[in-house]
From Swiss-Prot:
This is Putative transcription factor sel-7. It comes from Caenorhabditis elegans. Transmembrane segments: none annotated. It comes from the Eukaryota. Multimer. May interact with mediator complex subunit mdt-29. Its main location: nucleus. Residues 67-85, 124-133 have a biased composition (Polar residues).
Length: 324
């Protein structure tokens, strides 16, 4: 019998694998790699939290650190067991971060680059908000833009509506030509002179200053409506030359039309139908030169209204009678 002080063989068998496991080099390397991996993850998480704490403004910091515990406490059921080691470590890290933030706030050494970045973000976000305004606000702005300029009443609005119905690439050309047509008479259009010659270092203002006053006003209104006046100097010059060349070509075509006249585009009216003429054509088709010539075996007297030929067999009408 086994003595009571002697360990049981089962306990000895349980100790041997554990000792062999901890003495094994592969298990040690695996544990070391896992430990290094966990330390690396902990370091990265701490860096992320520090970046969030320094980059975000002070108003958003309490919401980050206070809102998650509230949601967890309200949703989680009451538990009787003690908190695990991971929870204790997370609480320690959060408390340490809070204390670090308090000390930084008290010393006044917070990084100001984060606030500058947020201000730039808010400034950049305010610009698209102005672009993505409601239709009423855009209509009010368009009315302000359309009201400017010494043009006939409603001319700019009609030009904008006509340009909106065309392709996007041709909208500025259509807009400018429509305003010019309503602002200039045909006699004035004959004497229009548009200069496209540019010199080295010339700007759009210099080029438009050498044009006629009405041409200059039309081009300036077009560039203002399509916000081309906010472009660079070279881009403004190219856009102004584009509009001027289009106006010059259209003025040439319009002057040629006024001088030579426009051909009549209306198709001539069809003459009324003559019933006698229709019957004559129908009889000509039934005559010897018509279908009769195509069918030579058909006797001519059938077409001419004569009697039937004896070669055609006669059909007894009594065959189609039905006895009552």
């Amino acid at each position: 019998m086994a003595q009571p002080n002697q360990p049981t063989p089962q306990f000895q068998m349980a100790q041997i694998p554990l000792a062999a496991f901890f003495d094994n080099n592969e298990s040690k390397t695996m544990l070391n790699s896992m430990n290094l991996r966990l330390n690396d993850m902990d370091l990265k998480l701490s860096l992320i939290l520090e970046l969030l704490a320094t980059r975000l403004p002070d108003q958003r910091l309490p919401s980050i650190f206070t809102s998650p515990p509230q949601t967890v406490i309200s949703e989680a059921p009451p538990q009787s067991f003690t908190p695990s080691a991971t929870n204790s470590t997370s609480d320690k890290t959060s408390s340490s971060l809070k204390t670090e933030l308090k000390t930084e706030d008290s010393d006044g050494d917070l990084d100001m680059e984060g606030e500058e970045d947020t201000e730039e973000l808010f400034d950049n976000e305010s610009q698209p908000s102005q672009r993505n305004q409601s239709p009423k606000e855009t209509e009010v702005e368009d009315e302000k833009v359309l009201a400017d300029g010494p043009f006939p009443e409603g001319a700019v609005k009609r030009a904008a509506e006509k340009a909106a119905r065309s392709f996007q690439s041709t909208q500025p050309k259509v807009f400018a030509w429509q305003i010019l047509r309503e602002s200039v008479t045909d006699d004035e259009l004959r004497n229009v002179q548009i200069s496209l010659r540019t010199f080295h270092g010339e700007t759009a203002d210099h080029l438009l200053g050498r044009q006629l006053p009405k041409i200059r006003l039309v081009v300036e209104a077009t560039m203002k409506y399509f916000k081309w006046d906010l472009l660079s100097t070279e881009s403004q010059l190219s856009k102004a030359k584009l509009i001027l060349s289009h106006l010059k070509n259209n003025a040439k075509v319009r002057n040629w039309t006024l001088r030579e006249g426009r051909p009549n585009r209306v198709a001539p009216a069809t003459p009324p139908v003559n019933v006698d003429l229709v019957w004559k054509r129908y009889l000509a088709l039934l005559g010897p030169a018509g279908f009769t010539g195509i069918l030579p075996n058909l006797p001519q007297n059938l077409c001419n209204g004569g009697t039937q030929s004896p070669s055609i067999p006669q059909i007894d009408p009594s065959l189609f009678k039905v006895d009552a």
